Curated annotation (Swiss-Prot):
Lineage of source species: Bacteria, Pseudomonadati, Pseudomonadota, Gammaproteobacteria, Enterobacterales
SUPFAM superfamilies hit by this protein: YehU-like
Disulfide-linked positions: none
A matching Pfam family: UPF0270
UniProt family annotation: Belongs to the UPF0270 family.
Protein name listed in UniProt: UPF0270 protein ESA_04379
Organism: Cronobacter sakazakii (strain ATCC BAA-894) (Enterobacter sakazakii)
Length: 72
């Protein structure tokens, strides 16, 4: 189930995005990006609709994923 990011308290949304970014592991790109930059990127993706917050009833967890990968 998609959770509208606009309905999440700002502090909670920030923590969800940070947890997601930290779970993603090491960035092997040419230039290392800070946590703040990565969080800002994910926030922009949520705002643009490119990414969505998803609640898994099976696992009772929240995840962030590309909208194109969501199979609701």
């Amino acid at each position: 189930m998609i959770i509208p990011w606009q309905e999440i308290a700002p502090d909670t949304l920030e923590r969800l995005i940070e947890a997601f970014v930290l779970r993603e592991g090491t960035d092997y790109g040419e230039h290392e990006r800070s946590l703040e930059q990565k969080v800002a990127d994910v926030r922009r993706q949520l705002q643009s609709g490119e990414a969505v917050l998803v609640w898994s009833e099976l696992h009772e967890t929240v995840n962030i994923m590309p909208r194109s990968q969501f199979r609701g």
